[in-house]
UniProtKB/Swiss-Prot annotation:
Lineage: Eukaryota, Metazoa, Chordata, Craniata, Vertebrata
Transmembrane stretches, start-end: 39-59, 81-101, 109-129, 150-170, 199-219, 269-289, 302-324
Keywords: Cell membrane, G-protein coupled receptor, Glycoprotein, Membrane, Receptor, Transducer, Transmembrane, Transmembrane helix
Cellular component aspect of the GO annotation: plasma membrane
Top-rank taxon: Eukaryota
Cytoplasmic topological intervals: 60-80, 130-149, 220-268, 325-372
Residues bearing carbohydrate: 4, 15
Protein's recorded name: High-affinity lysophosphatidic acid receptor
Length: 372
């Protein structure tokens, strides 16, 4: 019986013949290229595992770091760790050997785990984005650690329910030699296409739309606030001076209103969103083409494109901990604490001693830049 796909690249369609001859993946990439890709993949696995493990360890060991936003970031890091352990190694072996060596049952399980952990990471990023929207645009800071834990638990359950059909509904499975990766593949069954579209919409298009709207609103709010503060800063300061009976004195210098604590965390999440979009847009388009285009699915370039787009989704797991250490000072300092002294090449920069607690605080003009 020929193998096409239902929702997975390795699932069978009983009544559909294959129009083109299978490809031998051992000749899809040259041996030197496969070795280079394997080395890069191993480095990606190491960075994704160690970097995200440090993030989780920091939040676990330091009670001061267990804020709502850090709990969410730790959950995002944990989902990336699971990807690096249960999905990325098998992709590396497939690239080296040119075939799937782990059996059809594990291929189903592997596909389910891939979507499970990806959905969880996307759900956490969506929660963080909506939280930033509520704080900056709506002036509502309602997410505390307890509520964050509830939302994390709910996101795990929802992600599991969405990814579960990938492994429950398909029992007759074989791994085609032409593309032994468990990805969405061509199907003519309406139910399978509906599930595939639902999966891609849940993973990319809904989160992307909601986050894009949130960030556009946030950017507009920050811009309007900056203009308003700049316009009224001088009059506010002069009003304070007049109360002291000092109107005859020289006008004070323009006060510097600190908006950094309000925007820096948002900027970090915006960078994560941009990384998510760049890494997942190609794979989402690729997956939809695989489901609906027989010509594309059986083209000679399918395996190469599939490998590249899959790699991009893995890169997100590698970049996230790098972004945390780059953008979040407390994470950077904690990372330096975990590193041996001989590897501490970054200079110790004295940080500010205070930080604001509630991001929805209204700012007023002051003589010194406020601490973050």
């Amino acid at each position: 019986m020929g193998c096409n796909n239902t929702a997975l690249d390795n699932c069978m369609l009983p009544n559909l013949s294959i129009a083109t001859a299978p490809l031998d993946l051992r000749f899809a990439f040259s041996t030197p290229l496969r070795m280079l890709l394997a080395i890069i993949m191993i480095l990606m696995i190491a960075i994704a595992f160690l970097g995200n493990a440090i993030v989780c360890l920091i939040v676990y060991q330091k009670p001061a770091m267990r804020s709502a936003i850090n709990l969410l970031l730790a959950t995002l890091a944990f989902s990336d760790i699971m990807l690096s352990l249960f999905c990325m190694p098998f992709t590396a072996v497939t690239i080296i050997t040119g075939s799937w060596l782990f059996g059809t049952q594990f291929c189903q399980i592997s596909a389910m785990l891939y979507w499970f952990f990806v959905l969880e990471g996307v759900a956490i990023l969506l929660i963080i984005s909506v939280d930033r929207f509520l704080i900056i645009v709506q002036r509502q800071d309602k997410l505390n650690p307890h509520r964050a834990k509830i939302m994390i638990a709910a996101s795990w359950v929802l992600s599991f329910c969405i990814s579960l059909p990938s492994v429950v509904g398909w029992t007759l499975v074989e791994v085609p030699t032409r593309a032994p990766q468990c990805v969405l593949g061509y199907t003519e069954f309406s139910a399978d296409r509906v599930y595939a579209v639902m999966l891609i919409v849940a993973v990319f298009f809904i989160p992307f739309s909601v986050m894009l709207y949130s960030y556009l609103c946030i950017l507009n709010t920050v811009r309007r606030n900056a203009v308003r503060i700049h316009t009224h800063a001088d009059s506010l300061c002069l009003s304070q001076v007049s109360k002291l009976g000092l109107m005859g004195l020289q006008r004070p210098h323009q006060m510097n209103v600190d908006m950094s604590f309000k925007t820096r965390a948002f900027t970090t999440i915006l960078i994560l969103f941009i990384g998510f979009s760049l890494c997942w847009l190609p794979h989402s388009v690729f997956s939809l083409l695989s489901v609906f285009s027989r010509t594309f699915y059986y083209s000679s370039s399918f395996y190469s494109i599939s490998t590249c787009t899959l790699w991009l989704t893995y890169l997100k797991s590698v970049f996230n901990p790098v972004i945390y250490c780059w953008r979040i000072k407390k994470f950077r300092e904690a990372c330096l604490e975990f590193m041996p002294k001989t590897f501490k090449i970054l200079p110790n920069v004295r940080g500010r001693t205070r930080r604001r607690i509630r991001p929805s605080t209204i700012y007023v003009c002051g003589e010194h830049q406020s601490a973050v």
